[in-house]
Amino acid sequence: MRVVIQRVNKAQVAIDNEVVGKIKRGFLLLVGLRNGDELEQVKKAADKIAKIRIFEDKDGKTNLSLKDVNGEILSVSQFTLLANTKKGNRPSFVEAMRPPKSKQLWEDFNHELEDKGFHVETGEFGADMQVSLENDGPFTIVLDI
């Protein structure tokens, strides 16, 4: 499982120019599931995201978690995160998990985050989406589980 965590001031996702998910301060999560991922990886990723301290405290140190700043989450499924570009010029996506299991695990991931007390907005699994955001920092982390 690979999750790109982007610290944002705001973010939204639209489908056919209609906004389907929108947050203020928080995390934009781009989520890629790979073959072999199970609920164990989903829970581990959700736990890490809930606890990671990448917001600045009053002294300017990255010492605060998403919960500490009352942040929100926008979760977007993105299988292209698992692209293999080592050979040739055309990315291979053989490592990316296929639906319906990938959809179920992405939904499980979002539920895990909600169960931890976060407000979670989402894109639509498998849809062609337009994601817009205002990075805060920028501060971007790639989480591989």
Swiss-Prot record:
Its EC number is 3.1.1.96. It catalyses: glycyl-tRNA(Ala) + H2O = tRNA(Ala) + glycine + H(+); a D-aminoacyl-tRNA + H2O = a tRNA + a D-alpha-amino acid + H(+). Gene3D superfamilies: D-tyrosyl-tRNA(Tyr) deacylase. Keywords: Cytoplasm, Hydrolase, RNA-binding, tRNA-binding. SUPFAM superfamilies: DTD-like. InterPro entries: Daa-tRNA_deacyls_DTD (IPR003732), DTD-like_sf (IPR023509). It is found in: Cytoplasm. The keyword Amino-acid biosynthesis does not apply. It comes from the Bacteria. The keyword RNA-binding applies. One of its GO terms (biological process) is D-amino acid catabolic process. A motif (Gly-cisPro motif, important for rejection of L-amino acids) lies at residues 137-138. Its main location: cytoplasm. Signal peptide: none annotated. GO terms for molecular function: D-tyrosyl-tRNA(Tyr) deacylase activity; Gly-tRNA(Ala) deacylase activity; Ser(Gly)-tRNA(Ala) hydrolase activity; tRNA binding. One of its GO terms (cellular component) is cytoplasm. An aminoacyl-tRNA editing enzyme that deacylates mischarged D-aminoacyl-tRNAs. Also deacylates mischarged glycyl-tRNA(Ala), protecting cells against glycine mischarging by AlaRS. Acts via tRNA-based rather than protein-based catalysis; rejects L-amino acids rather than detecting D-amino acids in the active site. By recycling D-aminoacyl-tRNA to D-amino acids and free tRNA molecules, this enzyme counteracts the toxicity associated with the formation of D-aminoacyl-tRNA entities in vivo and helps enforce protein L-homochirality. Belongs to the DTD family. A Gly-cisPro motif from one monomer fits into the active site of the other monomer to allow specific chiral rejection of L-amino acids. Homodimer. This is D-aminoacyl-tRNA deacylase.
